[in-house]
């Protein structure tokens, strides 16, 4: 009908939809399925600080659903798994105060234990914090405060809560 009145039609896309990932990240998500964390999820200058849920299909939860409306195929999103904390500063402080602390125990104070175990394993860190270089601590903290991930897609219209696009509302009047 809108085309008959010469209205511009914007391509429709699924929005407010869970994101899917490559096999490596998907395996991690499956291991953490059901775990929810408070996170900041961002794409370009758009960010949302809300819950993020690991599922057997990828990532979901309010922050992921929101960012899915802005994310473009092929681009990375950034996830801050500990938005209230500068993890690198905390790790430096812990190392100064008690160099014998186990890195997994420290990360488990910041994140749920299952997530902490996977992050430490993925970063190949274990043992006393005093044994870890600044470079390793910085890399570990970046994977917590600025985890860059590249979704392979979304779950599509099947699970989308809304649709982007359609009739260009700039061409409509409420009068």
Protein language model regions, located:
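A glycine-rich dinucleotide-binding beta-alpha-beta segment and adjacent secondary-structure elements
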Residues: 117-175
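An anion/pyrophosphate-binding glycine-rich loop and adjacent beta-alpha core
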Residues: 8-13, 17-134
